[in-house]
Amino acid sequence: MEAVVFVFSLLDCCALIFLSVYFIITLSDLECDYINARSCCSKLNKWVIPELIGHTIVTVLLLMSLHWFIFLLNLPVATWNIYRYIMVPSGNMGVFDPTEIHNRGQLKSHMKEAMIKLGFHLLCFFMYLYSMILALIND
């Protein structure tokens, strides 16, 4: 059972790494004016909920399988994703809003957040890989 948890977590982490890279590429395209703000935000907003669900499922799965350290490591990022989604002001297009993305350095903060998430998911990838190998050896 433990190996199944880490195999699923590893696959989910791969998807989240892909999403983080996609966010970085799309935001850098906006920064370089290759795409406009509206198309950038619509592309990114449709992936916010899948990212939220994917990360939350892994976090809950780790809680249910009693892997406390990895759960506590994932909890702040999952909480941040939920908070960010819930706190979208009414009238905005989503987490990424084309009218506000160039204001107050939001583009830079979104880019920094995507980079931090990429680093976090890469760290988690290797932790899940190590834990999966350890679980398979112990079975």
Curated annotation (Swiss-Prot):
Coiled coil: none annotated. GO terms for molecular function: CCR5 chemokine receptor binding; signaling receptor binding. Involved in G protein-coupled receptors (GPCRs) trafficking from the endoplasmic reticulum to the cell surface; it promotes the exit of GPCRs from the early secretory pathway, likely through interaction with the COPII machinery. One of its GO terms (cellular component) is COPII-coated ER to Golgi transport vesicle. One of its GO terms (biological process) is protein transport. The chain crosses the membrane at residues 5-25, 57-77, 118-138. Belongs to the cornichon family. Keywords: Endoplasmic reticulum, ER-Golgi transport, Membrane, Protein transport, Transmembrane, Transmembrane helix, Transport. The keyword Transmembrane applies. The keyword Lipid metabolism does not apply. This is Protein cornichon homolog 4. The lineage of its organism: Eukaryota, Metazoa, Chordata, Craniata, Vertebrata. It comes from Homo sapiens. Pfam families: Cornichon. It is a multi-pass membrane protein. Interacts with Sec23/24 complex components SEC24B and SEC24D. Interacts with CCR5. Interacts with ADRB2 in the early secretory pathway. InterPro entries: Cornichon (IPR003377). It is found in: Membrane; Endoplasmic reticulum; Endoplasmic reticulum-Golgi intermediate compartment.
